């Protein structure tokens, strides 16, 4: 784990654009797979999806203002990350990335035996454990009672959070402009997105 975290930290520090485009491909592929699982999409479903995307994008935008990483925040990150173990198509790494704690958690893993790092990682694990216990029943009930709507909202959340993983150098407000500005800097970024896209497709086929 420590060796792997060192590699990821190196990539994040030196190849952030390539990593961002790779995650972008992962997300787009996950969205397509999840949409394919929904049968008979109606206009109301599309409206719910768009509304969910808008809500989460605004929440994440507010979260990025004066964000301070504390033990409580790391606990919340662990709590939210527990979704990745319950919900299909969501990566824990992706959730940490959009919450702005991915780099922080990896650094703490590399210095795990420091008292400070140990407390942060413990807070994260405890938050995840509480999240699993809490979310498992709620998510199970939602999928049993409102499977289609739950999937639609989940996809909307994924789409709405895309802007958080793409560097927004020109401070654009529109996700399409953010994406265009990012990929227009280097066409090689499309290649990394394609790899991410194909990875999810391959994993999905293997799982079947």
Where are the language model's segments positioned?
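Multi-pass membrane proteins that catalyze or facilitate reactions on polyprenyl-/lipid-phosphate substrates
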Residues: 1-87, 91-208
């Amino acid at each position: 784990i420590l060796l792997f975290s060192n590699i990821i930290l190196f990539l994040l520090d030196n190849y952030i654009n390539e990593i961002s485009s790779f995650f972008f491909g992962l997300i787009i592929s996950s969205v397509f797979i999840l949409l394919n699982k929904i049968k008979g999409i109606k206009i109301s479903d599309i409206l719910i999806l768009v509304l969910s995307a808008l809500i989460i994008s605004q929440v994440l935008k507010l979260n990025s203002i004066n964000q301070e990483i504390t033990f409580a925040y790391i606990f919340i990150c662990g709590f939210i990350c527990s979704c990745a173990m319950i919900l299909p198509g969501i990566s824990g790494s992706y959730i940490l990335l959009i919450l702005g704690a991915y780099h922080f958690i990896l650094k703490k893993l590399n210095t795990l035996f420091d008292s400070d790092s140990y407390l942060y990682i413990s807070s994260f694990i405890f938050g995840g454990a509480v999240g699993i216990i809490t979310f498992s029943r709620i998510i199970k009930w939602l999928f049993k009672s409102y499977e289609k709507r739950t999937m639609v909202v989940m996809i909307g959340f994924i789409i709405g959070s895309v802007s958080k993983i793409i560097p927004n150098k020109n401070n654009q407000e529109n996700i399409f402009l953010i994406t265009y500005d990012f990929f227009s800097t280097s066409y090689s970024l499309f290649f990394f997105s394609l790899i991410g896209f194909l990875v999810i497709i391959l994993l999905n086929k293997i799982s079947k």
